[in-house]
Amino acid sequence: MTGGRFDFDDGGTYCGGWEEGKAHGHGICTGPKGQGEYSGSWSHGFEVVGGYTWPSGNTYQGYWAQGKRHGLGVETKGKWMYRGEWSHGFKGRYGVRQSLCTPARYEGTWSNGLQDGYGVETYGDGGTYQGQWAGGMRHGYGVRQSVPYGMATVIRSPLRTSLASLRSEQSNGSVLHDAAAAADTPTGTRGGFVLNFHADAELAGKKKGGLFRRGSLLGSMKLRKSESKSSISSKRSSVRSDAAMSRISSSDANSTISFGDVDCDFCPVEDHVDATTTETYMGEWKNDKRNGFGISERSNGMKYEGEWANNKRHGYGCTVFPDGSKEEGKYKNNILVRGIRKQLIPIRNTKTREKVDRAIEGAQRAAAMARTKVEIANSRTAHARAKADAADQAALAARQECDIARAVARELSPDFYQPGPDYIKQRLQEGVDAKENPEEKVPAKPPTPKESPHFYRKGTTPPGSPEASPKYSRSPQPSPPKPAKKQNPSSGARLNQDKRGVAEEQVTAIVNKPLTSKAPTKEVGAAVSQSKYSGRHHVPNPSNGELHSQYHGYYVKLHAPQHPPVDAEDDDRSSPSSSALVHKPSPNKWSPPKSVTKPVAKESKAEPKAKKSELAIPKNPASNDSCPSMEREANSGPNSVMIVLVMLLNIGLAILFVHFLT
């Protein structure tokens, strides 16, 4: 057997022994472009026992077959470690995956790299699931046991987090960013608690205080009557069905399909549960959620037996409350839609009674089946732990073969660079830095783009914004403008178009500075003077005009031209400016029916300002006949708004009237 160093065309290198042109014995091989490293024993071109190190620092140490991980081995990826069997590159059949930072772990059977068969999953807060699995999800029969409510992990995301489950990382070991970013959302639930009923009397009043609440305006009169006459305990029972919401368990926080499990209307409100209370669910699971028949029971006496759908009470069932009262019937998304409630006259419906009884029997059978599956899962877990211990021995043997291969490589080629140890050192250094400076590892929220409109005031131009194209912008003439009493029709039309494009915030600016705060013209008036002004360049001349720093480059006259008052009135009637549209319609067109004198006072104050703003802008009587459509829009706009407001007011008064009568 000979040996040496061989460089591949793709940038990889093999340094070690070979036989008949194939790697044989001990050696080190790097991947394309020198990325990744395998060191260990070889047999006719294939890895046998050794370790592979990725550039990210993730490692595998164990047995190989036909170039794939096969047999027993240990994989370290990110904050997780898998110890157990491997089959053609995938995890399986028995193995244990555990977190390096929390108690989270899975022990059981695997298939194609996912949990499949029977197993036990322990979550970051100590809660457990024991039962059947399929395709990496809880599927079949199983038991979900929570820890005391005070110790349960607060899950703040509909996505799974690495604290709560095992399926929280990508293939390269990096944690999903969505799970970290969603920690800022207000949705907070306790792991393993789905029977979250808001039993507080004040919350009951708050829940039922809305105008359009269920049962107030168009609902049943009996519900309102029972609420007014019953005690606090009956209020609690009456609101349990309406306000109860589904809470995802801690295991549900990382499933790729566990979206929409939380009703955001009640997320910020926490139930008043004793810190020592625990909850257990025994029954059917489908696609990682409670689906089918099952029983959910709390240690304080609360219990539900019946049908489930997507972690919610859905179908027929019976709920027993801690005080001994109960409600039974048909549920739909945690709401009792048909059945028997406390303090209400029982519905004499034998079919409903029979369906409830059948649902309870089905739930009890499912719970019994789940308990038998738990026993099988525990036996599979014991076997998986034994395989994990054997995998540790295989990893130890792989490390020994790795050391031999490194010694052989150094002997054959002293200058050969072995990247594996550097990958591991870099990963360890990153871990130390993360512990010393945890605040640096917190991903900062991406800044809002600079072009976001809320970074600037209204009426101002963001810095760095491109200049308007000549097609839609007008620059003043190169020659210095002189004060003139007469204007040609084209300039008058351009100024009138300027008035129409004034923004809403210009009204205040014109009143205060009528000569220097003119807003930029809009594209509506650009077409009027396009042929005359589009090809000219802007020549600043501070002697005759003042350039407004907040708008585009155009001049505003320092001396307002004098016009007869008749022209201003005619122009006001023909082409109203935006300031006139802002101040006049509300007092003139519509006023509240109860107060008549106040709008008159506002009208008398608003007209001088509007006229003053109009007089501050040059006008041209020649353009009065050019905008009848603007006049119609100004007259029709406030009318439609007034009609809508009056209709809404009438509807609101009618609803209040009916509400008080009922």
UniProtKB/Swiss-Prot annotation:
Does Repeat count among this protein's keywords? Answer: yes
Q: What Pfam families does the record point to?
A: MORN
SMART domains, per the entry: MORN (SM00698)
Q: Which residues lie on this side of the membrane: Cytoplasmic?
A: 1-640
Q: Which GO terms describe its cellular component?
A: junctional membrane complex; junctional sarcoplasmic reticulum membrane; nucleoplasm; plasma membrane; Z disc
Q: Which residues carry this modification: Phosphothreonine?
A: 448, 461
Q: Which GO terms describe its biological process?
A: muscle organ development
**MF annotations from Gene Ontology:** structural constituent of muscle
Phosphoserine, modified sites: 157, 216, 220, 452, 465, 469, 475
Query: Where in or outside the cell is it found?
Result: Cell membrane; Endoplasmic reticulum membrane; Sarcoplasmic reticulum membrane
Question: Where on the tree of life does the source sit, at the highest rank?
Answer: Eukaryota
Bias regions of kind Low complexity — which residues? Answer: 584-599
Composition bias (Basic and acidic residues) maps to 432-443, 600-614
Relay the domain remarks: The MORN (membrane occupation and recognition nexus) repeats contribute to the plasma membrane binding, possibly by interacting with phospholipids.
- What name appears for this protein in its UniProt entry? Junctophilin-1
Look up and give the organism this protein is from. Oryctolagus cuniculus
Lineage, broadest ranks: Eukaryota, Metazoa, Chordata, Craniata, Vertebrata
Gene symbol here is: JPH1
